[in-house]
Structures are given as structure tokens and as C-alpha cells.
């Protein structure tokens, strides 16, 4: 008797998970995304539910969520074909919440990640050709407080200043409005 009720509970739980996924996909397909408080605290959810689909909707190619031990400062890698007919490669580091410019902040970590992202190659699936990024993006689900962006820019080599982009919640929501709309 208990095994039958356990199986029923497991089946209901699986069904609930499937429905949750379907509802999420329907919301996205209908052109909207509800910003969740969870995005401010859970980097993985922010990456999977916001950044990955947004990058794809923006038309980037080979969008890969690479978060983990061998990410080399990049939670995402992706590319685009430029007007000159060459591929431009990007690296994106995501953070949940705000980034501040205060003492003992996440800035030194971000600077190290940017340095790794530019210096270390990455490899596409089934390719032995190393790829190097030309643009590094810091995307956060909160906002950059005080002088955070200025500190990052001032601490990286001057040659990469024009290759750094900063996306906060406000700009991400603007991009969602532009690229996530129902066609």
C-alpha cells in the first residue's frame, strides 16, 4: 500500500515540475518575463531563465552556459557574425544582486575574472581551434552601486576599456523589452 502511495506522490511531483516548466515556457512565448526576486539571489536561475534565453533572442550564436570550475572568468561564451564577415566572440560573467565599489567588494574578483576571460582561450564543442573573446560583459541582476564600474575600468589594462560592457537589471529589462517581444 505504501509503495503505491509513494509512487503516486512521485508521479504528482513530476507532473507539477512539468507543469511549472510549461507555464514558464508559455510566459516567455507570450512575450513576457516576470522578474522574480529569486534572480537577485540565485545566479544559476538568473543565468538559465533570463540571460541564456535573452542572448539567444538577441541573435547571438553558439550561446553556451559554461559556469563551473573551468569557466576561466566566463559564465557564458557566445559569438556573432560581424558586418565584416568575421566572428566576434564574447565572454559574460553573471552575478546575482548588486555590485558595489566599496572596500572588500566583488570588484577584485570581477577584475580577475575579466583578466582570465581575455587571456584564456575557450573551445567550442567538436573544435580544436582556440577562441579568444574580444568583449567581456559583466551582467548583474541588481545594480552597480557607488563607483563600481569606474573601479573596474580603472583596474583593468587600458587596452581593454572599450571591450568591457556593463549590464544591470535596468538595462537587461530594456533589452528584454526590445528582444523578447512577441513577433
Q: What residue ranges belong to the model's regions?
A:
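Mixed-charge (Asp/Glu-Lys/Arg
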Residues: 1-183
Amino acid at each position: 500500500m505504501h509503495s503505491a502511495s509513494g509512487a503516486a506522490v512521485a508521479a504528482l511531483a513530476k507532473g507539477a515540475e512539468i507543469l511549472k516548466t510549461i507555464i514558464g515556457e508559455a510566459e516567455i512565448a507570450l512575450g513576457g518575463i516576470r522578474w522574480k526576486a529569486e534572480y537577485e539571489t540565485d545566479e544559476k536561475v538568473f543565468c538559465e531563465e533570463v540571460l541564456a534565453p535573452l542572448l539567444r533572442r538577441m541573435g547571438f550564436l553558439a550561446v553556451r552556459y559554461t559556469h563551473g570550475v573551468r569557466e576561466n572568468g566566463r559564465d557564458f561564451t557566445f559569438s556573432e557574425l560581424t558586418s565584416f564577415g568575421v566572428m566576434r566572440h564574447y565572454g559574460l560573467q553573471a552575478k546575482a544582486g548588486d555590485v558595489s565599489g566599496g572596500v572588500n567588494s566583488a570588484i577584485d574578483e570581477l577584475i580577475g575574472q575579466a583578466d582570465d576571460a581575455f587571456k584564456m582561450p575557450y573551445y567550442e564543442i567538436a573544435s580544436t581551434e582556440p577562441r579568444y573573446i574580444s568583449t567581456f560583459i559583466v551582467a548583474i541582476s541588481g545594480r552597480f552601486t557607488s563607483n563600481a564600474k569606474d573601479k573596474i575600468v580603472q583596474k583593468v589594462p587600458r587596452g581593454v576599456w572599450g571591450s568591457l560592457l556593463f549590464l544591470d537589471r535596468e538595462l537587461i529589462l530594456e533589452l528584454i523589452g526590445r528582444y523578447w517581444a512577441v513577433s
